[in-house]
Curated annotation (Swiss-Prot):
N-Glycosylated. It is a multi-pass membrane protein. It comes from the Eukaryota. The chain crosses the membrane at residues 34-51, 70-90, 111-131, 136-156, 159-179, 197-217, 232-252. The gene is ELOVL6. Disulfide bonds: none annotated. GO terms for biological process: fatty acid elongation, monounsaturated fatty acid; fatty acid elongation, polyunsaturated fatty acid; fatty acid elongation, saturated fatty acid; long-chain fatty acid biosynthetic process; long-chain fatty-acyl-CoA biosynthetic process; positive regulation of cold-induced thermogenesis; sphingolipid biosynthetic process; unsaturated fatty acid biosynthetic process. Keywords: Endoplasmic reticulum, Fatty acid biosynthesis, Fatty acid metabolism, Glycoprotein, Lipid biosynthesis, Lipid metabolism, Membrane, Transferase, Transmembrane, Transmembrane helix. This is Very long chain fatty acid elongase 6. It comes from Homo sapiens (Human). Pathway: Lipid metabolism; fatty acid biosynthesis. The keyword Transmembrane applies.
Length: 265
């Protein structure tokens, strides 16, 4: 159901990318995401135990490099996938932007779709810095990392509808988020409002994820969207749980602290 005919300019590495091999590899290996998740969980609990009796590591320069690398990657990903999605919206409409599988195998976006799902494994490295620097590790952080890895690998192999929206939104939010982390790690003073904006962007992303899932479900009934009920169920459960957790985090981190500050004054 690839009805996308793009006139967007491709870079040479995007042209040379073999999406068929990538999709086949993911179909054969997507379950390895469970192994990565198990190793990640083991590292979290083992690492925190080992660090209990050790002094924290500074790791400022490695953290700047790490965050900056992910920021640049996310910025390019957001620009390229965003260009694709805007083109489809302008020329084909909303339904096509949600249901078109061309995001996985079409020009421009095919490379970035695969890069996105693969990046969810190395992004687990965010937690290494938190543990080694003995910072607070909240449930939302590691739950989000594990579930995004599992779901993105699980969905990419089937080229399910909605993926273009999910990936483009995530690229966009991460472009801002990792840029913020890089600035903070480099010692720049960044307004608290910037952090609030990022969390609000994440909440908006989760709301949009729920809306996209609803549209996929409705259009799937008329054989206009390629997906299956099991995928929509897990995706909806994931996005709803994120929505609740990010709203709770926003209230605790910003609204609650504002109220405490007001009372103290």
């Amino acid at each position: 159901m690839n009805m996308s005919v793009l006139t967007l300019q491709e870079y040479e590495f995007e042209k040379q990318f073999n999406e068929n091999e990538a999709i086949q590899w993911m179909q054969e290996n997507w379950k390895k995401s469970f192994l990565f998740s198990a190793l990640y969980a083991a590292f979290i609990f083992g690492g925190r135990h080992l660090m209990n009796k050790r002094a924290k590591f500074e790791l400022r320069k490695p953290l700047v490099l790490w965050s900056l690398t992910l920021a640049v990657f996310s910025i390019f990903g957001a620009l390229r996938t965003g260009a694709y999605m805007v083109y489809i919206l302008m020329t084909k409409g909303l339904k096509q932007s949600v249901c078109d599988q061309g995001f996985y195998n079409g020009p421009v976006s095919k490379f970035w779709a695969y890069a996105f799902v693969l990046s969810k494994a190395p992004e687990l490295g965010d937690t290494i810095f938190i543990i080694l620097r003995k910072q607070k590790l909240i449930f939302l952080h590691w739950y989000h990392h594990i579930t995004v890895l599992l779901y993105s690998w699980y969905s990419y192999k089937d080229m399910v509808a909605g993926g273009g929206w999910f990936m483009t939104m995530n690229y966009g939010v991460h472009a801002v988020m990792y840029s913020y982390y890089a600035l903070r790690a480099a010692g720049f003073r960044v307004s608290r409002k910037f952090a609030m904006f990022i969390t609000l962007s994440q909440i908006t992303q989760m709301l949009m994820g729920c809306v996209v899932n609803y549209l996929v479900f409705c259009w799937m009934q008329h054989d206009q969207c390629h997906s299956h009920f099991q995928n929509i169920f897990w995706s909806s459960l994931m996005y709803l749980s994120y929505l609740v957790l990010f709203c709770h985090f926003f209230f605790e981190a910003y609204i609650g602290k504002m109220r405490k500050t007001t009372k103290a004054e």
